[in-house]
Amino acid sequence: MGLGFLRLALPLLMVAASAPAVAIPRLDLSGYPAPKQGLKRWVIQPSGLLPKSDDALISPHPLDWRVQLIVGKEVEMDCNVKRLSGPSLSMQRLPQASGKALFEVSGPVLVLSTRMACNSEQAKGKSFLSLGKQPYLIPYNASWPVVVDLPDGVELRWRVWKAETRQQEAVRL
């Protein structure tokens, strides 16, 4: 190795050594059964290091947070009203996986649409349609992955809900 190599390598090593070490957690899916035929596995690994909120009304405690699972499809939109129809998300506790759960939609998810004649000049676009009207919320837990099996062609999206710190009184009747 020549002196030129050291001149090039030394600054790179110093930069790498000064960067904070970040451990990348391994995704442990032991204890989960294989997806049933026709289903695809989707996995969410919530981070234990979410950015802190500047809003004092938002709880900083993960015990007050929830993960919303959003099952849906990206569909071509036109002048017709479209929505998804299919079985709702179900949860199955896994005894061999100590407290972990498997979520699943176990049937076909269909796009229902009105059948109006659309103007050919009208703009078309894609939109994500979600299955079901009510949010499907589960406790936030950075220790376990969220495992969801869905029919082919269906996607999973998610977001975190955080509770307010203040509690409000109800009216007693």
From Swiss-Prot:
Record-linked SUPFAM superfamilies: Ecotin, trypsin inhibitor
Keyword terms of this UniProt record: Signal
UniProt entry tagged with the keyword Signal: yes
GO molecular function, one term: serine-type endopeptidase inhibitor activity
Signal peptide: 1-23
Signal as UniProt keyword: yes
InterPro entries per record: Ecotin_sf (IPR036198), Prot_inh_ecotin (IPR005658)
Domain of life: Bacteria
Record-stated family: Belongs to the protease inhibitor I11 (ecotin) family.
Protein's UniProt name: Putative ecotin-like protein
Provenance organism: Synechococcus sp. (strain CC9311)
Lineage: Bacteria, Bacillati, Cyanobacteriota, Cyanophyceae, Synechococcales
